[in-house]
């Protein structure tokens, strides 16, 4: 069994974004036609008791408060969180680590590049590596996600590189092949994928999606020039390291023949019209078989 | 006039703290006998329209959502926030800066030590200094808080050093005299103080409090060995850089003759019994003339 909780479904900045009065953000703020969403993160478990967090969003403190499965019970201090797996070093994927201070043991996993970005920022020393060991992920190799008591969780993780870009604050250092990851998690029977950022859908990614049972995929933008056309930013989706949902080469097109998995869009930017519940774009993606992720959604892959 | 909104009233970790099942945190989580609080921050304004944020807590995104006065209206992007003033470089005072990314101009003010700590962490480069200028505070000198349009806000800020300690993640670098600040803000008529962390109450601090109209003071712990006795941490209040509310040399005792100001405890740790609404300690501090800060509380100092 794999249980999944969507802790947050929005891209960096969240929905609404702090400084935005664009129509989507106003709708989310006033709860009229669009639901607010915190920044993207998943909780994953094989037993419904011990959880692994995929990306530590800046909203993690609030996400834990809103998610009873992640509340500690019993002794004075503790957590059902066994580990955190990072797909990249972007602010919206790592800032929540600063919430997980307070000398609480868990395992922190990420690529060499991402762990190096943490090491380059002394503030993350608040998570003492003696208490929160930092474990580099070996790409394309299945590793058992271990509970804190040393017993295998029942989940196997395979991290793989996907086209992306360096974190905004580290762009000057240039691009590294392991800077953006996809994660494949299996209980040996069913498989889920988490690919919240992806600049290009390769044939390898299509193969992985076709074989999976549940896929959370980069839903940042509807179209590549969306931010530019809306007057929100000079940056294209490609410049930000994201393929766009409805463009040629995007997930709707590329995964159209992948009929096995449940397909979910996550890491959705506040400019994306699929966030409006009644928009034509929302109807389009739903008609194409996609679910638009919301905070608090749960998914279960049952072992037959 | 000075308007103040308490954006958050809790110490680092917030209330409840993510990994705590101590009685206070359970009470806050279940809303039985104690109100939840986000991490300490104030918003201050001379006109109720343009605001300055004192400390950028990790909860700042949620705090802005919960505070209509801080919502931008009108154009696509913007903010009523004119500037952010930091009292120290602790995680609970600076992490919220990462929420204020998105190329939105405002002024960032802090001591040389605190600005150096930001510079030592490239992640804060997400706030491009070309867009968010970093202005070192000159201690003990009144400076006009300027709105973004270059017009004085009507508020004068004086920052002064108080006994404290280096941020947790920078303790190895040793202590610096300007690492912990108190802030005095006046409209030329009324004066408020913000001293969320203070390891020792000096005669200078007593003089400032006696002359002020509104004081927000370090309410981290009730007694110095509170965390140790509760089995929560091996650290004393002194080790964490905080004088304790009810100890000899604490604010209740030292400011007992300061009858002019309204006195408010802020930056309250989740172990502090004053967070229980019906506790004897809560009654004690209220009887001594103190208010225990809550998120969303507002204060106004009127100019006669």
UniProtKB/Swiss-Prot annotation, chains A, B:
Name of this protein: Coenzyme PQQ synthesis protein B
Pathway: Cofactor biosynthesis; pyrroloquinoline quinone biosynthesis
Record-linked InterPro entries: Metallo-B-lactamas (IPR001279), PQQ_synth_PqqB (IPR011842), RibonucZ/Hydroxyglut_hydro (IPR036866)
Pfam families named among the record's database cross-references: Lactamase_B_2 (PF12706)
GO biological-process terms attached to the record: pyrroloquinoline quinone biosynthetic process
Reported function: May be involved in the transport of PQQ or its precursor to the periplasm.
Transmembrane regions listed in the UniProt entry: none
Highest taxon, organism lineage: Bacteria
Protein family: Belongs to the PqqB family.
Keyword tags: PQQ biosynthesis, Transport
